[in-house]
């Protein structure tokens, strides 16, 4: 005769899982037990106005991350971002981290309201880890993309007040039929719509138009990792040249774009030594050419 397993209490403020729980989504569990901890609920909501007391839009009251680029290459995919955050017409920070590894085979970059976006991506990483612990297997890439879409959709109320978050997800799909198609890029809109980017490159944020224009000229799907990384940094340089909210390589302060590469071996942060060397080389070449793009 066996005794029933006791259940953990789930009273107010108790966020522990009960025995036998099959809830594999940490976000949904949090929504049911401690909704105030979700990124979209950590701000004060205004019922009728998006303007602050001084007449500023809500979106100008918090720092914003700007430009993120992603591109596939032979054997993998990479994600890179500039380091600047702006607040209205001011530079709020020069060294923000906007590119995050979310699990062994995926990474996400953020554009939009920095505070909410950073919390959302960190929660997404916990979501993926929680799912794998509960189910015993990792989510497929499509599953990851769908989970992130639902999290972005959950921020719609804040987005309607000007505090939008627009992530860019990349990953290596272990279930892909061809290794050449294993690197994948997924973009989102503010209401949680997800879009597979099949051109091999994409960009989000205020400088995305200029970054994509640059990538259109220099991108090659058959490039190796170093060539792809150079293309990403060069596109961010071009974006910073025309968009004041995007920060280019800052040689004076030693601030350079950050990047993550993902291959069959997993996700890896590109070292600052590598990005700084490429950035210095690009700046030197542009200086010799009189500031013109090649």
Curated annotation (Swiss-Prot):
Disulfide-bond pairs as recorded: none
Pathway this chain belongs to: Protein degradation; proteasomal Pup-dependent pathway
Record-listed E.C. numbers: 3.4.25.1
Annotated GO MF terms: threonine-type endopeptidase activity
Compartments, record wording: Cytoplasm
Subunit structure: The 20S proteasome core is composed of 14 alpha and 14 beta subunits that assemble into four stacked heptameric rings, resulting in a barrel-shaped structure. The two inner rings, each composed of seven catalytic beta subunits, are sandwiched by two outer rings, each composed of seven alpha subunits. The catalytic chamber with the active sites is on the inside of the barrel. Has a gated structure, the ends of the cylinder being occluded by the N-termini of the alpha-subunits. Is capped by the proteasome-associated ATPase, ARC.
GO CC field: cytoplasm; proteasome core complex, beta-subunit complex
Protein name in the entry: Proteasome subunit beta
Annotated control of activity: The formation of the proteasomal ATPase ARC-20S proteasome complex, likely via the docking of the C-termini of ARC into the intersubunit pockets in the alpha-rings, may trigger opening of the gate for substrate entry. Interconversion between the open-gate and close-gate conformations leads to a dynamic regulation of the 20S proteasome proteolysis activity.
Function: Component of the proteasome core, a large protease complex with broad specificity involved in protein degradation.
EC class (word): hydrolase
Active site (record annotation): 66
Organism from which the protein derives: Rhodococcus opacus (strain B4)
SUPFAM superfamilies: N-terminal nucleophile aminohydrolases (Ntn hydrolases)
Known catalytic reactions: Cleavage of peptide bonds with very broad specificity
NCBIfam families hit by this protein: 20S_bact_beta
Family: Belongs to the peptidase T1B family.
Keywords assigned: Autocatalytic cleavage, Cytoplasm, Hydrolase, Protease, Proteasome, Threonine protease, Zymogen
Residue positions assigned to the propeptide: 1-65
Pfam families to which the protein is assigned, alphabetical: Proteasome
GO BP terms in the entry: modification-dependent protein catabolic process; proteasomal protein catabolic process
